[in-house]
Amino acid sequence: AYNNYISDNDSKMASYDYKEDTIPVNKITILSNATNCGMKDPVIWANLTELVVNARERAKIHTPYIICNDVMYRSLEEMAVSDADIILMTNSAPNNDNPVGAAELESSMPDILATGIDLWEFSGEKAYHGKSIVIDDNISIIGSFNMDIRSTYLDTELMLVIDSEEINAQMSSYMEKYEKQSVNILSDGTKENPYNVTEAEYTSKRKARKTLIQKLFSWARCFF
């Protein structure tokens, strides 16, 4: 079937130069959790933690949700005390279109801040769903992994680790656009707003769902 397609579309294929739309890289590595059903070893989480902790100068982490257990909080502590400048950006609770993610961020904020991680909350027009990391000037990581218990222990997930200065520069530029729509949450819970962002506010519907989950369903946070 493939050969027939190529033969039938020879003129289209011949006129396309993949090199014009691609970038040479030094190396690409695929990170994956196991594919079995049920609980899994946190392979991706362990690898991402190691990569971030070993950053020489900087690391930027973007994730839609932060839902951690004690092991994951300890990993954030390791990141926070590394020599590199590390930031973690996620949706603010009112801006999060996942009610479990919103409820958990509010409830666990003291625990997140206690790790010492430099936390930023995104308040753009729509909820942010980027799952990406840039490290130093050459490593870019992107894929399906959320920084939550489900991605860490239940779902398979995939992340690409790309060694390329050009890809890193592109990713950093894209990520910075979102960071400029976020506010910095300080260790005491107060906020700094260097980009004069208009912070998202709860709609009545989102606030009601968030409150219901906090009161009745917080025990199920690892399944969402």
Regions found by a protein language model. Give the residues of each.
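Charged, low-complexity intrinsically disordered terminal segments
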Residues: A1-F224
